[in-house]
Design a protein with these regions (language model features):
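Conserved hydrophobic beta-strand within the GNAT/NAT acetyltransferase core sheet
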Residues: 96, 130-134
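A conserved beta-turn-beta hairpin within the catalytic core of GNAT-like acetyltransferases
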Residues: 86-96, 106, 152-154
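A short beta-loop-alpha structural element at the N-terminal edge
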Residues: 15-33
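Conserved beta-strand in the GNAT
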Residues: 70, 76-85, 95, 100
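Conserved active-site alpha-helix within GNAT-family acetyltransferase domains
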Residues: 112, 124, 128, 136-154, ...
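Conserved GNAT-fold acetyl-CoA-binding loop/helix
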Residues: 36-58
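A short helix-loop-beta-strand connector motif used in the catalytic cores of GNAT acetyltransferases and
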Residues: 58-70
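Conserved acetyl-CoA-binding loop-helix of GNAT-fold acetyltransferases
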Residues: 101, 107-120, 146
Length: 169
């Protein structure tokens, strides 16, 4: 059963209504379009295609530990947020994997509303910790800092690139 949370983020004179819903597989194409438009722009400048975004989103959504929310204003998709629940020794944590708001709708409170809705849903199921990986910078790291997230003193992100040699066929 889909849960909806109605929100009022615009001025009363705008006559716009918003709602936050659980993400649904039937909307993957719509989510992918938003994902590509946001993450292929500043500050990320990624190179997503609709196809690769759809694969990523659908793969994530099909896991049993997935939890995600979508924000609509006047039936137009404005933002999505999702992660995976993980059991740790001290409770359930969530790895917040993706979070984006339509570029033209950023800095209007939509992201904060979406994050609060996810936090509310996580609280209901006993999630005790949220962690994420993001790019350095005020638009990314700064956004989370302003909402109570802190850099971990005892964790580090490490990567290893090009460890698998690919052969041409």
């Amino acid at each position: 059963m889909e849960k909806e949370a109605f929100i009022d983020l615009y001025d009363k004179d705008s006559n716009k209504t918003g709602k936050i819903t659980d993400m649904e597989l039937s909307h993957v194409a719509e989510y992918a379009e938003l994902f590509v438009s946001v993450f292929n722009a500043e500050p990320w400048n990624d190179s997503w295609t609709i196809e690769t975004a759809q694969i990523r989103i659908e793969n994530m959504m099909r896991t049993p530990t997935f939890i995600g929310k979508a924000l609509y204003v006047d039936n137009a998709l404005i933002g999505i947020i999702w992660g995976q629940k993980e059991q740790y020794y001290n409770g359930i944590h969530i790895h917040l994997q993706e979070f984006c708001v339509k570029t033209s709708e950023q800095n209007k409170g939509f992201g904060s509303a979406l994050l609060k809705a996810l936090e509310g849903a996580l609280s209901e199921i006993g999630v005790s910790n949220i962690y994420l990986i993001t790019s350095k910078g005020d638009k990314t790291e700064g956004y989370y800092s302003k909402r109570g997230f802190v850099s971990s003193d005892n964790m580090v992100l490490m990567t290893k690139h090009s460890f698998c040699k690919r052969t041409e066929k």
